């Protein structure tokens, strides 16, 4: 300030002293004013700067609130937008509220249906936990994030609902993990997360040597949840562990039984309700036995129990010391069941056609390879097999999880279920809405991959005809309760059903079940549909067996690839090749040795150049990576519950 004062005091030297004094005073006033103005300008400038900074921060905060990140979500926004786009995410529609099938139901059965559909939601809650212990916490997390307008969580939830869980494989066999850092566990949600197959085997060996026989029996059955118990493991029956939800299901089934118009279906509801209240596998057996007798009931209800996902339990089959110890204690390990809940309306016309095959099953049983070495469920005296065609209302839990696909039909109960030991049979349920197809898309597929002269023999309905043979062949052949095929058990069994269904096409034509035209359509359609987009993962039993069959049929001249890269089926070569493969499969099951099953799968699970040529074409035809199921009727029923 001193230099500034000096500068401001310089004046004309000709002025007198008085004037200089006045000017000096005035200069001081001016100085004060100028300083005040400068300070004011600085303050205003700082204020404006602060205002705009705060406004920018506020805008940034608003931006973050409208599109927040989802820290626990495993897929980026770009990938989520792609996978949830209709081009990549297909839709399967089940029965709608205005469907004639629903309208035709008796009012009492509609009332019963209300409680059955509600029961499905409780079972899905159980299966979420069996599938992965993190499913429900992650689902709740997504729902909380969606309430905060989190778009990433919203799109993730669409995929979660479609695949019914965090982890799944898409149609290109890519593993999809919706939660960040989360992977599929070998013991799914029924074993401790950190338990490996090797540790599992060591613990069981230790427990058996210490005579903890019953504990091991409980750990290795198909219906228990397993936990650590110090240096050991312990098990709790899932009916006991999920008692609250199972009781809710039982309560709903009891209510439904009060309204059901069909006496047999009502009896089944009561038996199933009883089985869900007490941890006793024999109660399930009585319910399953009754269920397997149901044919022309108005309503369809199945609690599905199948064991494809758990690889911890089946790992015992390649540990000879453990095998010997288990055999000495008469313990047969069975992989853990995953649970599903199917609800529908029985379609009479479709069921009529299905049941026509029943009379021919004893003849097919006679023609099974090595039939003199084992007993079969299907004999001349008794046919413990029935089947229904169902219009679907809801698929909850495991049966409704779209993980690279949803099954066209199911043949239950499986060999490990106790109902088969008390005279119970099996029942096939076929899914009408799942087998629906798009005619335009089918034609594009044929133009792309099938020799023009054979287009006439490709028919999507032939998939259904073939599936009838496939499902019934599950009931043919040896019933191996103590399967030692490990992770190859399901691959071998599904292969048996496929090759049996194909091998007996000629027999069923000669017996009058199929027409000659249907025979040709089944053969061509099955061979064409054996071509996949990509080589599947070994965990995908249904797809692995498809590659194996494709390779085997090619080696036996059942088809060729034309110069322009299209499939030509050598129709009359297919059935003999299928029967030869069926013979190999049955021998693997009868020998019941892990090493032979492994060798067999590795021998034929080969992705050839021909498969890649067709697979690449199929990828250009459809971009669909996953699909979701819409159940409008079920949603409406639940909204009015």
Segments (PLM) and residue ranges:
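Short, hydrophobic alpha-helical membrane anchors of single-pass surface/secreted proteins
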Residues: 29-38
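Fold-level signature of zinc-dependent metallopeptidase catalytic domains
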Residues: 76, 86-115, 215-481, 487-495, ...
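Core hydrophobic alpha-helical transmembrane segments of single-pass membrane proteins
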Residues: 37-48
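Extended, compositionally biased alpha-helical segments that mediate assembly or anchoring
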Residues: 378, 586-641
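N-terminal helix-rich structural modules
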Residues: 73-272
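Ser/Thr/Pro/Gly-rich low-complexity linker/stalk segments immediately outside membranes or between
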Residues: 55-82
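Intrinsically disordered cytoplasmic terminal tails of membrane proteins
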Residues: 1-29
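Long, well-structured alpha-helical subdomains associated
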Residues: 502, 506-604
């Amino acid at each position: 300030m001193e230099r500034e004062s000096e500068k401001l005091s310089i004046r004309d030297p000709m002025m007198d002293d008085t004037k200089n004094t006045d000017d000096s005073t005035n200069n001081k006033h001016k100085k004060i004013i100028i300083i005040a103005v400068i300070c004011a300008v600085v303050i205003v400038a700082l204020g404006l700067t602060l205002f705009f900074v705060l406004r920018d921060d506020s805008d940034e905060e608003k931006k973050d609130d409208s599109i927040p990140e989802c820290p626990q979500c495993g897929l980026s926004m770009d990938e989520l937008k792609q996978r949830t786009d209709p081009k990549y995410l297909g839709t399967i529609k089940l029965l709608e509220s205005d469907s004639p099938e629903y309208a035709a139901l008796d009012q009492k059965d509609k009332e019963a249906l209300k409680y059955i559909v509600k029961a499905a939601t409780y079972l899905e809650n159980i299966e979420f936990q069996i599938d992965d212990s993190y499913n429900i916490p992650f689902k709740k997390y997504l729902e909380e994030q969606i309430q905060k307008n989190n778009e990433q969580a919203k799109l993730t939830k669409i995929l979660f609902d479609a695949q019914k869980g965090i982890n799944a494989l898409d149609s290109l066999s890519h593993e999809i993990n919706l939660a960040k850092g989360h992977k599929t566990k070998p013991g799914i949600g029924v074993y401790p997360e950190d338990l490996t197959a090797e540790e599992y085997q060591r613990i069981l060996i230790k427990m058996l040597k210490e005579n903890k026989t019953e504990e091991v029996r409980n750990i290795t059955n198909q219906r228990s949840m397993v936990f650590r118990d110090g240096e050991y493991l312990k098990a709790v029956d899932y009916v006991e562990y999920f008692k609250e939800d199972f009781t809710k299901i039982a309560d709903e089934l009891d209510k439904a039984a009060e309204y059901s118009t069909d006496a047999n279906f009502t009896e089944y509801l009561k038996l199933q309700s009883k089985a869900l209240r007490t941890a006793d596998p024999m109660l399930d057996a009585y319910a399953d036995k009754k269920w397997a007798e149901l044919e022309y009931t108005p309503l369809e209800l199945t609690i599905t129990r199948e064991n494809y996902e758990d690889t911890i339990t089946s790992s015992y089959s390649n540990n000879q010391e453990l095998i010997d110890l288990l055999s000495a204690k008469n313990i047969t390990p069975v992989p853990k069941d995953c649970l599903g809940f199917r609800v529908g309306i029985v379609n009479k016309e479709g069921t009529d056609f299905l049941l026509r095959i029943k009379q021919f099953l004893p003849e097919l049983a006679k023609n099974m390879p090595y039939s003199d070495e084992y007993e079969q469920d299907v004999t001349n005296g008794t046919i413990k097999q029935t089947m229904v065609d169902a219009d679907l209302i809801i698929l909850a839990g495991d049966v409704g999880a779209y993980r690279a696909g949803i099954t066209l039909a199911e043949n239950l109960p499986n060999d490990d279920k106790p109902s088969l030991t008390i005279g119970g049979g099996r029942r096939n349920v076929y899914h009408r809405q799942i087998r629906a197809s798009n005619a335009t898309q089918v034609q594009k597929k044929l133009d792309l991959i099938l020799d023009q002269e054979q287009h006439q023999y490709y028919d999507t309905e032939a998939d259904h005809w073939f599936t009838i043979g496939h499902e019934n062949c599950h009931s043919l052949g040896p019933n191996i309760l103590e399967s030692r095929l490990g992770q190859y058990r399901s691959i071998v069994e599904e292969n048996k059903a496929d090759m049996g269904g194909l091998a007996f096409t000629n027999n069923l034509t000669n017996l009058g079940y199929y027409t000659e035209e249907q025979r040709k359509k089944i053969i061509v359609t099955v061979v064409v549909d054996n071509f996949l987009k990509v080589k599947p993962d070994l965990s995908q039993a249904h797809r692995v067996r498809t590659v194996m069959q494709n390779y085997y049929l090619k080696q036996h001249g059942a088809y060729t690839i034309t110069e322009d890269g299209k499939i030509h089926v050598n129709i009359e070569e297919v059935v003999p090749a299928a029967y030869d493969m069926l013979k190999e499969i049955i021998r693997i099951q009868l020998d019941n040795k892990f090493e032979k099953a492994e060798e067999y799968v590795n021998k034929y699970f080969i992705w050839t150049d021909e498969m890649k040529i067709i697979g690449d074409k199929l990828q250009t035809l459809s971009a669909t990576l996953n699909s979701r199921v819409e159940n409008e009727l079920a949603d409406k029923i639940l909204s009015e519950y």
